[in-house]
Amino acid sequence: MWPLSHRHLCLAFLLVCVLSAISFFLHIHQDSIRHGLGLSVLCPDRRLVTPPVAIFCLPGTPMSPNTSSPCPQNSASLSGTWTIYPDGRFGNQMGQYATLLALAQLNGRRAFILPAMHAALAPVFRITLPVLAPEVDSRTPWRELRLHDWMSEEYADLGDPFLKLSGFPCSWTFFHHLREQIRSEFTLHDHLREEAQSVLRRLRLGRSGDRPRTFVGVHVRRGDYLQVMPQRWKGVVGNGAYLREAMDWFRARHEAPVFVVTSNGMDWCRENIDASKGDVMFAGDGQEASPWKDFALLTQCNHTIMTIGTFGFWAAYLAGGDTVYLANFTLPDSEFLKIFKPEAAFLPEWVGINADLSPLWTLAEP
């Protein structure tokens, strides 16, 4: 046999390299097709025929408590892209998040949140929905749908693969069948929970100095509602008489409860809530720019007294236990009742105490 020349060896080596490269790219191509990625992974400039689904997540947004994968759970059984406009304050965006999650699951769609919602909720909760990349948001041919604040039959059969929701949904009728999942999504980060529990551990009953065994979170909504409710909605906010009746309801049913008061009007609370029994603690800081401190306190209590608003609703929903709420807080002809259904806003087992509407009758007098 003739010995191989140096040139022959070089040619053989090059042939092996070429064949290996071809085999490698064929493997990558087949794998990308099998996983639905197509050529866009290898050729980023290639325009996709259908709008892409973002797999971009901001740091700190794991997809489940046990993984940091950037892909949605059970994504193989879901399709399309749904999101929701983040609008309003803390409680509003919690309602939007929970409603998006529930409706997307019901319709077999992938749910994504926008960066602004992530910025509002992720510092507080262990939320798992991925964040939609801005470039994907801008390229997607959305159909938009404004939701009203209660579940409707048509919401269970939405055929749109690319849907952007809006509105201020915060009704248990959307998501109560997923209560444990919603509670998991809104699990506080450890440092916030521990800080709130540390505050509660330091509380003592005023007369005896004993450590309380039952904590009742009290949220008193003030701020802009003082003008909005009477002037726009023919409604009222909770007054001192309502709070006294609600506290007496708990005193009659629980041994030595302590009432942990939070509000965006703490000065009003100190002036109008009777603390002479030694069981009322004004623990909230009232800082609307950092509402999670008060929110964490409320969720770590056993029971809840709320006035009005989504902040109080979510505190009660996550805390569990007994909840007392302000009922019938508008006049019967209020426009508010066109966008708000009490039976869809408050859980059936919650206890309502009727509001005092006499200030509204005074305003209506000529």
From Swiss-Prot:
Molecular function, one GO term: alpha-(1,2)-fucosyltransferase activity
Glycan attachment positions: 66, 302, 328
Membrane-topology descriptor: Single-pass type II membrane protein
Protein name: Galactoside alpha-(1,2)-fucosyltransferase 1
Record EC number: 2.4.1.69, 2.4.1.344
Location in the cell: Golgi apparatus, Golgi stack membrane
Similarity section: Belongs to the glycosyltransferase 11 family.
Intervals, Cytoplasmic compartment: 1-8
GO biological process: one example: fucosylation
InterPro entries (alphabetical): Glyco_trans_11
Reactions that this protein is recorded to catalyse: a beta-D-galactosyl-(1->4)-N-acetyl-beta-D-glucosaminyl derivative + GDP-beta-L-fucose = an alpha-L-Fuc-(1->2)-beta-D-Gal-(1->4)-beta-D-GlcNAc derivative + GDP + H(+); a ganglioside GA1 + GDP-beta-L-fucose = a ganglioside Fuc-GA1 + GDP + H(+); a beta-D-Gal-(1->3)-beta-D-GlcNAc-(1->3)-beta-D-Gal-(1->4)-beta-D-Glc-(1<->1')-Cer(d18:1(4E)) + GDP-beta-L-fucose = alpha-L-fucosyl-(1->2)- beta-D-galactosyl-(1->3)-N-acetyl-beta-D-glucosaminyl-(1->3)-beta-D-galactosyl-(1->4)-beta-D-glucosyl-(1<->1')-N-acylsphing-4-enine + GDP + H(+); a neolactoside nLc4Cer(d18:1(4E)) + GDP-beta-L-fucose = a neolactoside IV(2)-alpha-Fuc-nLc4Cer(d18:1(4E)) + GDP + H(+)
Coiled coil spans: none
Regions that span the bilayer: 9-25
Major location category of this protein: Golgi
Residue ranges, Lumenal side: 26-366
